[in-house]
Amino acid sequence: MDENGLDLSLGLPCGGGAASEKSKSGSSSDSKVEEVDRDGKVINDFKNFLDGGTSSQKHDSGVGSQRSDSTKHEGNLLSSINVDVDASKKLNSGGFWVQNDSRPVEVEEDRRADVGDKRKNLFRESSQQKKQEREGHHADTHDKTRTSHISITTDEGSTAENEDVADSETVGSTSRQILQHDESSKRFVGSSGLAEVHKELRSVPASSGVELIGQRRFTISSEKDVKFGNIPYTIPFQGQSINIMNLPYSMPLNSNTVSTTSTTSYPVPGVMQLMATTCVDRPPSHPVIPAYLPLMFGYSSVQLPTLDNDNLHGVASHLLQLHPSHGRGPLGSDKQKDGPNISQAAASSIPHKSSDSVQYDGRAMEHVKGNGRQHKAEETSNSRGEENVKGSNISFRAKDPPDQPRAEAVPSEFSTIRPGLAADLKFGGSGSYPNLPWVSTTGPGPNGRTISGVTYRYSSTQIRIVCACHGSHMSPDDFVRHASVEQTSQEPGTGVSSFPSSNPAASAQS
């Protein structure tokens, strides 16, 4: 008997035949056991051959741990088979073959399970390595793109290549959802593209302007994304000054620096442009005139229109023309639509001194420059109130004595006629001077004399003078000729009508 329990003895012809025959005839079970032992040896040799081929194949594949595992499995398999053979001696042959047939199937299942586990481990290691590489690459690209300009111009060719590479990497992987999440974080996808664009744009420092043309940062992979490649303007951000001069429209701004004193709305072309260009450093290209100041084009300040604060119907144009010589002006210059007004000759006083006339003109100009309000004339007597005409817009207030006579100014072409009374003119009765618009003139020639008269308005364009010597009503020309002729002789063609003989001025004249 050897170590495996097999009978190695051989039958010898000399003396051994009887023993062998005795053993054969003694029990049939011994012969059957020997046959079973031989069959078990053949089976073991066949299994060793199969196991040796499998271990050689695993050795060729380069996995060293698999060979050691297979060797252990072989040792365990042989020991288990020997134990089963020893235990099966007490059993019949049918039960032995049933036990022997089930062992190879279990070994094959165990081997397949081990191979599947190793494959899973290798695939997990490779997937983790790829994931780490992708995360490192994503971090590098994110750091690089933070300092670069952003462009959302779509590139279809690179989009297709990126999608193919992403699909090839995620085929057969159990972490497909994680990869898709990583890819979606890198790109602007679907309807949230515009919101993602604004989020990325906010991460850029505020001091740098972000341009949408010329440079590129990310590529949009979806065909439904919003395309900004054709936008011809730049997007302003915090910290970037907006140049309103380049915009095609005007930006209205509320400003309290310009105030108006009336309800009339007159457009000022330059004001809006000044308001719009206050945001930038450029100076305004057009001068601006505030609405509350009148436009001045070389005219004197006396002739400028002023605002009527008492009347809110608009701008009241009070044009005042003062003649430099004692307030005389053109005839009928203050004609208004509401009716004829008293002329400036009737409104000016008869000063005895030139200084009074200057002060009078200065007061008139000061009133017009100040607030443009109307001033009423002082009524010193009943006769003065009767002479004033209703509807006049501008009157003058002179600080002269109430008993000083007044006279209407004569047109400038009659330079010989001056306001005031003659020095030698005397009145009868109480001897007081009536408060009337007196004028005087001296006739030319050797027979000329100084006469006085009272002016009044004859029509809208003419005035008449009543002489104090005869009480005749005549034109300014006739009044000058009347002073040049002798008192006793009068021209028949002048059409002079005389007052009654009870005229105190005519009777008192020497």
Swiss-Prot record:
Ranges of biased composition (kind: Basic and acidic residues): 31-44, 103-146, 363-389, 397-406
One GO location term (cellular component): nucleus
Disulfide bonds: none
Low complexity bias (residue ranges): 497-510
Biased composition range(s): Polar residues: 148-160, 485-496
Compartments it resides in: Nucleus
InterPro entries registered for this protein in UniProt: Ninja_fam, TDBD
GO terms for biological process, alphabetical: jasmonic acid mediated signaling pathway; negative regulation of DNA-templated transcription
Pfam family, any one: TDBD
Record bears the keyword Transcription: no
Location of the region described as Disordered in the Swiss-Prot/TrEMBL record: 1-179, 323-414, 481-510
Keywords per UniProt: Nucleus
Induction cue: By methyl jasmonate.
Entry similarity comment: Belongs to the Ninja family.
Protein name: Ninja-family protein mc410
Origin species: Nicotiana tabacum (Common tobacco)
